[in-house]
């Protein structure tokens, strides 16, 4: 978990997420339906839908299930009245936390989100309280590659930045609207993309110690266990040394 790697800070949670496959599928389908409703069913012209499809495929959802969800969104089915809502708050250690929800009932959603903050020593803030600390970006992960060749391909494709990580992987940042075109350009250059998504990147991070790190992880788990929560973003940083103590 060294450095400010967004991916490194979530790797330790993959196993727990896999154990909740049914709930994950429900959330993925919601996102597919909503993305198709808002931006249409053409993956090439709808970055949000493409990201949703990629996530669904990486979670081993079948193409048939994905296509049915997209058709429901385009056709205006009963579950297309979902709205995206962002809640902002403060977590353990003074961390900034943003919670992206997809819901048809705001009262139900807030009744799930608020207690999670309270139980973990944090508190739900007002709109704009921490949002200014994050930027919406496209993020592409390449597992292993020649750095010079990848940098050239990424720049040619229109990427904003590329960062080498200690484990040999690379994180490529783009304007969120350009994620699809940059991804296509990098793939066309022959590189294998491990993951790609639109995400929220913090401008500053908060180093967590062995006392506060578990509390933040508990908060994230509680929030992601809420049915209406799609994504949780935070600026907590857990070092390798602290991670070894958890």
Curated annotation (Swiss-Prot):
Keywords: Cytoplasm, DNA-binding, Transcription, Transcription regulation. One of its GO terms (cellular component) is cytosol. InterPro entries: Integrase-like_N (IPR017856), TACO1_YebC-like_2nd/3rd_dom (IPR048300), TACO1_YebC_N (IPR049083), Transcrip_reg_TACO1-like (IPR002876), Transcrip_reg_TACO1-like_dom3 (IPR026564), YebC-like (IPR029072). GO terms for molecular function: DNA binding. It holds the Pfam family TACO1_YebC_N. The keyword Transcription regulation applies. One of its GO terms (biological process) is regulation of DNA-templated transcription. It is found in: Cytoplasm. NCBIfam families: PRK00110.1, PRK12378.1, YebC/PmpR family DNA-binding transcriptional regulator. Belongs to the TACO1 family. This is Probable transcriptional regulatory protein HD_0596.
């Amino acid at each position: 978990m060294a450095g400010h790697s967004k991916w490194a800070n979530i790797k330790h949670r993959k196993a727990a997420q896999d154990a909740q496959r049914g709930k994950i599928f429900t959330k993925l389908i919601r996102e597919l339906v909503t993305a198709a409703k808002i931006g249409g069913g053409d993956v090439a012209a709808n970055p949000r839908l493409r990201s949703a499809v990629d996530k669904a495929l990486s979670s081993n959802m079948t193409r048939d299930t994905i296509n049915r969800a997209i058709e429901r969104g385009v056709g205006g089915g009963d579950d297309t009245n979902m709205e995206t809502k962002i809640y902002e708050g403060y977590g353990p250690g003074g961390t900034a936390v943003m919670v992206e929800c997809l819901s048809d009932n705001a009262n139900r959603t807030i009744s799930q989100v608020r207690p999670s903050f309270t139980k973990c020593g944090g508190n739900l803030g007002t709109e704009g309280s921490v949002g200014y600390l994050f930027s919406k970006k496209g993020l592409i992960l390449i597992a292993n590659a020649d750095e010079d060749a990848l940098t050239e391909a990424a720049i040619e494709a229109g990427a904003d930045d590329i960062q080498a990580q200690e484990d040999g992987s690379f994180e490529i940042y783009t304007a969120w609207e350009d994620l699809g075109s940059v991804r296509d350009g990098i793939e066309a250059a022959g590189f294998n993309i491990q993951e790609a998504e639109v995400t929220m990147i913090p401008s500053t991070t908060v180093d967590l110690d062995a006392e506060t790190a578990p509390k933040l992880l508990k908060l994230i788990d509680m929030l992601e266990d809420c049915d209406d929560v799609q994504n949780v973003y935070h600026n907590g940083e857990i070092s390798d040394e602290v991670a070894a103590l958890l």
